[in-house]
């Protein structure tokens, strides 16, 4: 069976840390494909200002264009309504019913997962892969370990922990650094840097 993981996020902007995690998921877990899913109108960030969805999609597209096992979907970007994870998973399960679907996200999301819409459907439609993110407690901390076990027991699911080396950078830090005029070339694919410079983003 083909195994694919949806890697959802605002990707504002996509950076080398995202790409590093996607590589780790492919090679450590034997996945066939990572589908990057830039969010269109995420409910948890409805009140926050984020870069235009089509620009974020374009940055992901150019960042991964040379990677044979990476693809990018405009499914959520093209939606005019709020983007919910369960809805996206339902769509892709219907589209590729014989594919085994996974959802790749930060381990910190486990702490708020039960606030997500139709969380029971989410765990029915996919298997979760979680990874550590900079600025959040390590996955081995007691609170996240307890939450992992609680979710697994409650929803009869198995959450996979991707124990990958941490790339210490975040999109927030990159945006702030660009605003302050700092060099961020090391943290981004060259193609993404070019878009940011050409369109004067994050100033």
From Swiss-Prot:
The record's listing under SUPFAM superfamilies reads: Nucleotidylyl transferase
Show which residues constitute the signal peptide. Answer: none
Write the Enzyme Commission number(s) for this entry.
Answer: 2.7.7.18
Q: Which domain of life is it from?
A: Bacteria
**Disulphides:** none
Q: Name one GO molecular function term.
A: ATP binding
User: What InterPro entries does UniProt report for this protein, alphabetically?
Assistant: Cyt_trans-like, NadD/NMNAT, Rossmann-like_a/b/a_fold
Q: What are the UniProt keywords, alphabetically?
A: ATP-binding, NAD, Nucleotide-binding, Nucleotidyltransferase, Pyridine nucleotide biosynthesis, Transferase
Q: Which GO terms describe its biological process?
A: NAD biosynthetic process
Q: Decide whether keyword NAD is in the record.
A: yes
**Pathway(s) where this gene product acts:** Cofactor biosynthesis; NAD(+) biosynthesis; deamido-NAD(+) from nicotinate D-ribonucleotide: step 1/1
Q: Which reaction does it catalyse?
A: nicotinate beta-D-ribonucleotide + ATP + H(+) = deamido-NAD(+) + diphosphate
Function of this protein?
Answer: Catalyzes the reversible adenylation of nicotinate mononucleotide (NaMN) to nicotinic acid adenine dinucleotide (NaAD).
What's the family? Belongs to the NadD family.
Q: What NCBIfam families does the annotation carry?
A: cyt_tran_rel, nicotinate (nicotinamide) nucleotide adenylyltransferase, PRK00071.1-3
Output this protein's name. Answer: Probable nicotinate-nucleotide adenylyltransferase
